[in-house]
Amino acid sequence: MESAADRLARAAAQGRVHDVRALLEAGVSPNAPNSFGRTPIQVMMMGNVHVAALLLNYGADSNCEDPTTFSRPVHDAAREGFLDTLVVLHGSGARLDVRDAWGRLPLDLAQERGHQDIVRYLRSAGCSLCSAGWSLCTAGNVAQTDGHSFSSSTPRALELRGQSQEQS
């Protein structure tokens, strides 16, 4: 027999708002992991902002981390281009400054996929590419962040910039 946590995760993954609401109202925890160890907010249909809002209103952890990839729901929303869901997650306390297992921020993922609306939102929320340190930055990221394009002189400029920041 399928557990309540599995039913809630499946309903969230399929974007079935009515079923998600019914299960939450019946007392199923929005943070209970399914049989694969994932919570409903981790497996929800990212494009259904109503499911996200409902789970969050019932106390889902907007910062839950995937134990394998270290990604969080904001990484998924940014990568897949779901601005409305990202806004709801952020409004519920989701951190935008966390990196996944490959060192990528949600902003990096949105930039890689060309989701400029998400890039604009994340920048307006105070995010910047490579905000956690130079070791994980690419030269192109830093050049773009500063409003420049990448050129053959960029690596030397980055080296000098990094040295001046270390001395500060």
Curated annotation (Swiss-Prot):
UniProt feature coiled coil, ranges: none
UniProt key word Repeat: yes
PTM summary: Phosphorylation seems to increase interaction with CDK4.
Effect the entry attributes to changing H18P: In strain: 020, BALB/c, BALB/cJ, C3H/21BG, C3H/HeJ, CBA/J, MA/M4J and PL/J
Residues found modified as Phosphoserine: S152, S164
Effect of P73L: In some liver tumors
Result, substituting V74M: In plasmacytoma cell lines
Main location, first listed in the record: cytoplasm
GO BP annotations listed: apoptotic process involved in mammary gland involution; cellular response to hydrogen peroxide; cellular senescence; epidermis development; glucose homeostasis; keratinocyte differentiation; keratinocyte proliferation; mammary gland epithelial cell proliferation
Effect on the protein upon substituting G27E: In some liver tumors
UniProt effect for mutating A12V: In some liver tumors
SUBUNIT field: Heterodimer with CDK4 or CDK6. Predominamt P16 complexes contained CDK6. Interacts with CDK4 (both 'T-172'-phosphorylated and non-phosphorylated forms); the interaction inhibits cyclin D-CDK4 kinase activity. Interacts with ISCO2.
PANTHER family xref list: ANK_REP_REGION DOMAIN-CONTAINING PROTEIN, CYCLIN-DEPENDENT KINASE INHIBITOR 2A
Name of this protein: Cyclin-dependent kinase inhibitor 2A
Gene source species: Mus musculus (Mouse)
